[in-house]
């Protein structure tokens, strides 16, 4: 089953008002439907992670060949990924022990299984189903899983309200949530955010004027302001008081 599991628990008072959110480790996730996720956010991840997502059948042979050629040309460094969004969904929901792999054989075995299941999954479900579950499953740093909670954590808003600039920030995190954390490493995130926007422009997802507006946006100042507000309200990784109740 490639559907994400583990969600936060909302505590309500006797009048139905949210007063707290209980978060177990690995469960800080809210489920959102594909209709609630901005198309720019979907395209940001496609542009950066899997440009042929809407064309391939689960694995991207072109990407695999490109990664192989790059690895050979670099003297055996095969660090360039060729995993599709479908494969990444499976890695995050089925092969959850991948971080403990200790050998090349372990990684290769998992990759082969991943590729096989990716093709089988794409025979059974739509691209929208895959995208929805992928965006609900990904680790986006700061103990957030999925774009809904990450949107609240970094921008203090519902995911449906994200601007293009903010969408690019979230997509920039996913390769390495620690290194590209927009709070602790805004410069690194900004570099990768530019790659997201450049890819979106090159792949025809956005216009030049949309690109220019996003590039000019001072998004990192807003992120720091939201972070300060959340810290003032006593947020932490495992138990956070609902923001609405702390105003």
Q: Where do the PLM segments sit?
A:
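Aromatic-capped interface at the extracytoplasmic side
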Residues: 1-5
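Extracytoplasmic/periplasmic solute-binding protein
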Residues: 231-239
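Conserved small/polar residues in nucleotide/adenosyl-binding loops
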Residues: 241-246
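Terminal amphipathic helices with adjacent charged low-complexity linkers/tails
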Residues: 193, 206-230
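Peptidoglycan glycan-strand catalytic modules in the bacterial/periplasmic cell-wall system
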Residues: 13-205
